[in-house]
């Protein structure tokens, strides 16, 4: 799939899609916002040369001066959004900004062996076969995932980022897909930069490998918040623009509620481990990476059901089973 061309979106906002070094998603939408005294870049993609060249060409094609970028705001701590942050900061001399929860998560992001150990432990207690877990996993950290630095400045929910002429970007903390995830809302137009929180065609994966007990609960609460705000035009990090962000958020919320009900029904029939729920909930021809994502998403759903009192859990000597 070819990467779309950069384009002007109006209201001093520009979109530069940058290719990614894996099958899906094939690109990330970065956004450039004119901010009176310069430019703000929202997200930057992974650290590989095609992505960097796409950004450089995008600025040139749009008639923008990349040296005017004074701030890089990253929506969340995933490599397709933050991976090139060190290079952007070094080459453009800009500030690197994220939500305050990122400060405690950067070391975890950089700790590749620790991430692998946590996933292996989780897979073991929830019944995921070791051959499925290890299939297709790189032995070393990919080059496009360099270690990242701490942000220069930390944002909190409710902050307003001044972009000139009485206009600002409101910071909305929307954890779930990732703990430090933020959306930004333009005070003048109401446009929402949604990162991965709201996507046009898929629900972002809510993985149970985060430093929080109920990532799915946090995600659903974040969706409900945006629904209540009446979000309209939405600029996501992947895919096409969304006309009604609140309606899409509701669709995603209802999808998760249905999946929760389906999984609760499966567990009610017999005590079962998470991997058995995975194999009965997803199509059988997933590739290795998608099996791992399906597993982590399923554990998030089962733990949300358990924490909300809809199912129980027993430990059978190193193997966790869920029960209705």
Model-derived regions: residue spans:
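Conserved beta-strand hairpin/beta-sheet module of binuclear metal-dependent hydrolase folds
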Residues: 4-62, 66, 183-194, 200
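Short Pro/Gly-enriched beta-strand edge/turn motifs at strand-loop
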Residues: 11-18, 138-145, 165-167
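Metallo-beta-lactamase
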Residues: 39, 46-48, 140-153, 160, ...
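Histidine-centered divalent metal-coordination motifs
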Residues: 75-81, 99, 175-177, 181, ...
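Short, contiguous alpha-helical
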Residues: 90, 174, 306
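Short hydrophobic/aromatic-enriched beta-strand-loop microsegments
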Residues: 93-98, 193-195, 288
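C-terminal regulatory/interaction regions
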Residues: 262-324
